[in-house]
A protein has these predicted regions:
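Conserved mixed alpha/beta catalytic, RNA-binding, or beta-rich assembly cores of soluble enzyme
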Residues: 1-73, 77-117
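Charged phosphate-binding loop/patch that engages nucleotide di/tri-phosphates or the phosphate backbone
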Residues: 112-128
Length: 128
């Protein structure tokens, strides 16, 4: 499964002819309003609220629901999607690929493994 987090990342991956099975966007780029990436093949649209700097229970539940929905799935976040990379790495099946943008750096690609899940869980534990 390929999962993108972020409007620019999603837009760039789609422009390469790759359709992420799950796309998480918020209509923002570097905290500025932008048009959402175009994708006329979306089968399922889910929404959630997630304020900047937080990971809400609603977003976690929406991410979990996405993995049992018909792909391609787009999650539209009211707020900010940046930190949702973390619960995505926990919920994604092993061998999934999670892509997100690191501002002013480039694209980050995470191959989900048990080791990645353990590292992410430690980060989430510290955040709680």
């Amino acid at each position: 499964i390929i999962i993108t987090v972020g409007d620019k990342t999603t837009e760039n991956i789609i422009s390469l002819g790759i359709r992420p099975q799950i796309q998480i966007i918020d209509g923002l780029e570097k905290r500025n309003q932008r048009d959402i990436p175009l994708d006329d093949k979306i089968s399922t649209v889910l929404t959630c609220k997630n304020p900047p700097g937080e990971i809400t229970q609603e977003s976690i539940q929406t991410i979990q629901k996405a993995f049992s929905s018909d792909p391609p799935i787009r999650i539209i976040v009211d707020g900010e999607e940046d930190l949702l990379v973390l619960p995505v790495c926990i919920a994604a099946p092993e061998n999934s690929v999670v892509m997100y943008g690191q501002p002013n750096e480039g694209l980050v690609i995470v191959h989900v493994t048990p080791e990645i899940r353990a590292k992410v869980q430690k980060i989430l534990d510290v955040m709680n």
